[in-house]
Amino acid sequence: ITGNTPYPKSGMIAYVSGTIVARHLTERLKGKPLAELPPELPTNICYSFVDSEEAIWVSANYSWDEAEKRIKAQSQVDNQRSKANGEAAIGWALGLWNDMFGPA
């Protein structure tokens, strides 16, 4: 599929897509046939801070709809600002940074 995908233009989609490609390349370099690699679609979450401690978020999971021959998104939203969401956002960011750049 080229263009017209349901994915937002976000750093999270880029990051998750990169990890999927890396896993597939690693398996192919080990000799695993392409047909044996499981199909994977990215996931997405976006946190937005509404003040210095509270955040809201939206997330999406994607699946292939064989009947319609297209990717479908299933979204979840928490628009109730909370400190717990703010803490989750910080934890999410620290986890990504640790994965990309190594432990601080």
Question: What spans do the regions from the language model cover?
Answer:
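FAD cofactor-binding and catalytic pocket of flavoenzymes
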Residues: E36, P42-Y47, E54-W57, K69, ...
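A conserved FAD-binding loop/helix module that cradles the flavin
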Residues: I1-P42, S48
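C-terminal auxiliary extensions adjacent to catalytic cores
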Residues: W57-A104
